[in-house]
């Protein structure tokens, strides 16, 4: 089953953000709040729940009155098209079944929970995952591989892989030589 990247065919994409009060969640919220084809219907977090979005995030235009809920409350929202998980490393993979995602929902995980094969995941993150859940996820950069998406569970590449892939994509079309990328990072990795 091939799914088309949602924004291409939907006029009003209904979105949820789990982990909306962390760095990744906040940045995603800022981007989606201004997107003409997106309506944010749910903001989840582990703390700062029951607060209005405007009390934590300045500059919002369309999502100011949303109440931040507990991440697990997503179970009660049946009309969400896409759920973005911006939760800390390991939280989604350890608690996947508790969220009870709907069959019609697409889930895009922005953590590293489903990026690495099991042996490397345990080595680097010390987290054991459910193999059946891991198999549902496809590690793919949708912006460059829309037609190759074969699942509703997307494991989005991290900042390094994304910045490199997006930067060299145009060059890759015209060059036949090997491209070497030399990237550096500070302590945070962000």
Label each PLM-derived region with a short phrase.
Residues 2-190:
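N-terminal Rossmann-like NAD(P) cofactor-binding subdomain of oxidoreductases
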